[in-house]
């Protein structure tokens, strides 16, 4: 992870990572803010503080020290898992209870990070490879929805949107085919730029939000008032944090494999503690719980640029645009179909890397084949048929609402079962 790049290259690589996660980062505050009835000024704050905290959380995770920080090229963003619970808590107990629950959940994760770190033994290659595949597969519907124009769009599925999205995909693939070196490493960024330029001539780019946005926005402690603590809300948000840790674990193992690093219990403990700190800070500044973003795994694999310096630039950019709303608004001009076209390549690379991780597994073992088949099938099923567990409520609803969690728990449970019942049935080549 010691590649050398000049300042301009680092900036472009960091910008590429930021643009890849930006849509997901601002979508959560938009949904939550609208659902809990925030006014325009409050919503502006929520988006700005979220971007600021995404950057701060990323930098915390990069800072590998004695107590926290996994030191992998990982980008953190607000977790989609929190959307439903935050809206529910806000409507039941009020907005301050949302942030009391986030603060409590973050503090518990920080204190229990040592316990969570011991779970590393439950993640052999057959489990981690399956989990990474599930993460990638579960993101494909998001990519296709965006390519079509985004859910709720009046032009959803229009020929213009589809051609624009697939055109971006084709452009990125052509860059990979005809170029090597640095051009190939920023193919996603160039695809986004080219797609936005094409969309401009199609009348799909609107700069009005850039003109209307303010120049400076300062983070504020307890912006929505002093937090309140309700036990049901705290328990719910703790479950959200645990789901986020499970999702992050797959990302950590994928990045460790890409960067040829073996993760220890201590590494995971520090990674989880950094994530807990990010969640805690999110609560204090009235933002969100945070988790590792899997789309950035695809970019690391595509670009072959594994330096944490690149991700540090991403973190700094996010902090900066969180302080300067006008800069943040500039990134929103990228049309949704353009993002969708790039996502197809990024998320596809996450899937392919999961397959690569499974190449170290003994696929002659029926136990391993059953672990992969069952975990991927259940994870994909829960993702594509979200109504499957609609009758559940409370904690069960939070856990079952994530295909990644369903698939991960299935892989872990089956691996433990086969190891216990038939010690040689799920052997893994090391």
Swiss-Prot record:
<keyword id="KW-0813">Transport</keyword>
<dbReference type="GO" id="GO:0042906">
    <property type="term" value="P:xanthine transport"/>
</dbReference>
<feature type="transmembrane region" description="Helical">
    <location>
        <begin position="233"/>
        <end position="253"/>
    </location>
</feature>
<keyword id="KW-1003">Cell membrane</keyword>
<keyword id="KW-1133">Transmembrane helix</keyword>
<feature type="transmembrane region" description="Helical">
    <location>
        <begin position="122"/>
        <end position="142"/>
    </location>
</feature>
<protein>
    <recommendedName>
        <fullName>Uric acid permease PucK</fullName>
    </recommendedName>
</protein>
<keyword id="KW-0472">Membrane</keyword>
<feature type="transmembrane region" description="Helical">
    <location>
        <begin position="398"/>
        <end position="418"/>
    </location>
</feature>
<feature type="transmembrane region" description="Helical">
    <location>
        <begin position="274"/>
        <end position="294"/>
    </location>
</feature>
<feature type="transmembrane region" description="Helical">
    <location>
        <begin position="333"/>
        <end position="353"/>
    </location>
</feature>
<dbReference type="InterPro" id="IPR006043">
    <property type="entry name" value="NCS2"/>
</dbReference>
<feature type="transmembrane region" description="Helical">
    <location>
        <begin position="369"/>
        <end position="389"/>
    </location>
</feature>
<dbReference type="GO" id="GO:0005886">
    <property type="term" value="C:plasma membrane"/>
</dbReference>
<feature type="transmembrane region" description="Helical">
    <location>
        <begin position="67"/>
        <end position="87"/>
    </location>
</feature>
<feature type="transmembrane region" description="Helical">
    <location>
        <begin position="310"/>
        <end position="330"/>
    </location>
</feature>
<dbReference type="InterPro" id="IPR017588">
    <property type="entry name" value="UacT-like"/>
</dbReference>
<keyword id="KW-0812">Transmembrane</keyword>
<feature type="transmembrane region" description="Helical">
    <location>
        <begin position="18"/>
        <end position="38"/>
    </location>
</feature>
<feature type="transmembrane region" description="Helical">
    <location>
        <begin position="209"/>
        <end position="229"/>
    </location>
</feature>
<dbReference type="GO" id="GO:0042907">
    <property type="term" value="F:xanthine transmembrane transporter activity"/>
</dbReference>
<feature type="transmembrane region" description="Helical">
    <location>
        <begin position="163"/>
        <end position="183"/>
    </location>
</feature>
<feature type="transmembrane region" description="Helical">
    <location>
        <begin position="43"/>
        <end position="63"/>
    </location>
</feature>
<feature type="transmembrane region" description="Helical">
    <location>
        <begin position="97"/>
        <end position="117"/>
    </location>
</feature>
<comment type="function">
    <text>Uptake of uric acid.</text>
</comment>
<dbReference type="InterPro" id="IPR006042">
    <property type="entry name" value="Xan_ur_permease"/>
</dbReference>
<comment type="similarity">
    <text>Belongs to the nucleobase:cation symporter-2 (NCS2) (TC 2.A.40) family.</text>
</comment>
<dbReference type="Pfam" id="PF00860">
    <property type="entry name" value="Xan_ur_permease"/>
</dbReference>
<feature type="transmembrane region" description="Helical">
    <location>
        <begin position="185"/>
        <end position="205"/>
    </location>
</feature>
């Amino acid at each position: 992870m010691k590649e050398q790049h000049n300042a301009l290259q680092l900036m472009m690589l960091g910008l590429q990572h930021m643009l890849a996660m930006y849509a997901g980062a601002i979508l959560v505050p938009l949904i939550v803010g609208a659902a809990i009835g925030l006014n325009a000024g409050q919503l502006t704050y929520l988006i700005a503080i979220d971007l600021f905290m995404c950057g701060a959380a990323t930098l915390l995770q990069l800072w590998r020290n004695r107590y926290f920080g996994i030191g992998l090229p990982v980008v953190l963003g607000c977790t989609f898992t929190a959307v439903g619970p935050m809206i529910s808590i806000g409507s039941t107990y009020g907005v301050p209870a949302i942030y009391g629950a986030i603060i409590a959940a973050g503090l518990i994760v920080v204190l229990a990070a040592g316990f969570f770190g011991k779970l590393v033994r439950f993640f052999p290659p057959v489990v981690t490879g399956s989990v990474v595949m599930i993460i990638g597969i579960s993101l494909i519907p998001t990519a296709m929805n965006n390519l079509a124009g985004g859910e709720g769009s009046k032009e959803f599925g229009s020929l213009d949107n589809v051609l624009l999205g697939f055109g971006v995909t084709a452009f990125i693939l052509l860059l990979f085919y005809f170029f090597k070196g640095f051009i190939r490493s920023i193919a996603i960024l160039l695809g986004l730029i080219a797609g936005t330029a094409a969309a401009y001539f199609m009348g799909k780019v609107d700069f009005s939000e850039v003109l209307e946005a303010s120049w400076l926005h300062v983070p504020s402690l307890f912006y929505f008032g002093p937090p309140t603590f309700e036990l049901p809300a705290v328990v719910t948000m703790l479950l959200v944090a645990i789901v986020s840790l499970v999702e992050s674990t797959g990302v950590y193992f994928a990045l460790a494999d890409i960067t040829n690093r073996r993760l220890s219990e201590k590494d995971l403990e520090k990674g989880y503690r950094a994530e807990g700190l990010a969640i805690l800070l999110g609560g204090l500044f009235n933002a969100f719980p945070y988790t590792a973003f899997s789309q950035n795994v695809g970019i690391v694999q595509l670009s072959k640029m594994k330096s944490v310096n690149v991700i540090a630039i991403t973190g700094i950019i996010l902090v900066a645009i969180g302080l300067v709303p006008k800069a943040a608004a500039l990134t929103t001009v990228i049309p949704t179909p353009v993002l969708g076209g790039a996502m197809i390549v990024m998320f596809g690379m996450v899937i392919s890397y999961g397959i690569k991780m499974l190449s170290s597994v003994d696929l002659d073992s029926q136990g391993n084949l059953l672990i992969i088949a069952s975990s991927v099938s259940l994870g994909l099923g829960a993702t594509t048929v979200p109504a499957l567990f609609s009758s559940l409520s409370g904690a069960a609803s939070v856990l079952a609402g994530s295909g990644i969690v369903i698939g991960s728990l299935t892989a872990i449970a089956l691996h433990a079962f086969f190891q216990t019942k038939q010690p040689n049935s799920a052997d893994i080549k090391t």
